[in-house]
Amino acid sequence: MLGAPDFRAAAASFLEKHLTTCTLDPDQLGVSAGATSVIEMTSFILADSGDVAVIPAPCYPVYKQDIGNMSGMERYDLITHHELSEIRGGPSLSIADLERAQTEIKRAGKRFRMLILTNPDNPTGGIYSHQQLLKCTNWCIDHGIHLVVNEIYGLSLINTKHSVIREDYTEDTVFYSFANIMQAKQSDLLHLWYAFSKDLGISGLRVGLVYSQNEAFIRAYGNVNLSHTVSNYTQWVLQLLMSDTDFMSSYVANNCERLTESYAVVIRHLKELQIPYVPARGSLFTWLDLSELLVEDTSAAEHDLWLDLYRSAGVLLTPGEGFGHSKKGLFRLVYPCVSKHDLGTAMDRLSGFVLRKRQGTS
């Protein structure tokens, strides 16, 4: 129950052309009803209850439920920085960070079972360099730890040469698919997640993928996938879509262009307001710092600020608390879901809110 053979072949071909740039074996792909199912079953197969998955913070909040509800695996938020300025050039994860996490987990009497990286990252939009991925890979293999890279935003990339944002990028880091490292290493400890929901804007169709060269893992995945399968009709429709190579090439290019234009609208306003943010290279988000507006350095104050912004300005951000980071007052802004005009209106409202707060008039 890994998915229809024709669909998996079409998915492998699509990913080879647009994401991985290396050959994928369709027999090593598992297809499930969305990214949540893929994450949940991967965790269930690879981990025992009480094992620990290490995830650099800030991270996607629902990882906690996705990895824990079925398998009982715990999430460890690995703090690698405090200020946003420390990750303006990209994620700051180092081997020293991994060693520190391993020491703390062992001290607690638990097992460091899995390292999860999202690339491009949610919520920061940062991209792990080839060298960072390689160092993490070698460390995980040396320590017998599973490394999973989630490339769900791998085709949602920002054009860093855009005139409004190009000054933010001093290093020419480009997206490098983890599949290439997997191909070179041929290790049972390396796995790749992908889903079509974000890059293709089809969240409701619920189609996620796992790619692994671990034959025992793939067999187990097929055994437990029965209740998580994607409907034949959905697989057929998406197979036809992926097979239209001219359309898909045009779509991917246009999507990145429009994503960049919307991102530039956000950054133009943040620069004018001098609000700290992390320069994104991909994903659908901007990670920004509104801590100056907190009445006190607490989670409660962050929640109050989040609610005040929504009630008084009609702008809904994602508060930072669930992302597992140490600093209060950080928020995630999701920008691709509306037109540039409406996005501009939202940013004007955010600007007005910030200015009123600074002047003490609200």
Language-model features, listed with the residues they occupy:
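Conserved PLP-binding catalytic core of the aspartate aminotransferase-like
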Residues: 256-260, 264, 273-312, 337
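Conserved active-site segment immediately N-terminal to the catalytic lysine
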Residues: 149, 162-197, 217-220, 315
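PLP-dependent enzyme catalytic core of the Aspartate aminotransferase-like
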Residues: 13, 185-186, 298-299, 308-317, ...
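Conserved core of the PLP fold type I
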Residues: 1-142, 154-184, 348
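Helix C-cap/helix->beta junction micro-motif
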Residues: 142-143, 273, 313, 357
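Hydrophobic residues in well-ordered beta-strands that form the structural core
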Residues: 55, 77, 149, 317-319
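PLP-dependent aminotransferase class I/II
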Residues: 189-282
